[in-house]
Amino acid sequence: MAKKSLKVKQAKHQKFNVRNYTRCNHCGRPHAVLKKFGICRLCFRKFAYEGQIPGIKKASW
């Protein structure tokens, strides 16, 4: 889990655009964040299996 201070630090407007980075809105993870959903791949997988993300289902071919 991310420290609360890192979440607050990331939420502030940065002076330079390259300092901005995405964090998972659910767990605060800074890596592998899907911008479209605003959550990391781990939370995305969990929510998709639970059916909490509408229109998402497991692929099979």
UniProtKB/Swiss-Prot annotation:
One of its GO terms (molecular function) is rRNA binding. SUPFAM superfamilies: Glucocorticoid receptor-like (DNA-binding domain) (SSF57716). It comes from the Bacteria. Gene3D superfamilies: 30s Ribosomal Protein S14, Chain N (4.10.830.10). Its cofactor is Zn(2+). Binds 1 zinc ion per subunit. Binds 16S rRNA, required for the assembly of 30S particles and may also be responsible for determining the conformation of the 16S rRNA at the A site. NCBIfam families: PRK08061.1 (NF005974). This is Small ribosomal subunit protein uS14. It comes from Mycoplasma capricolum subsp. capricolum (strain California kid / ATCC 27343 / NCTC 10154). The lineage of its organism: Bacteria, Bacillati, Mycoplasmatota, Mollicutes, Mycoplasmataceae. The gene is rpsZ.
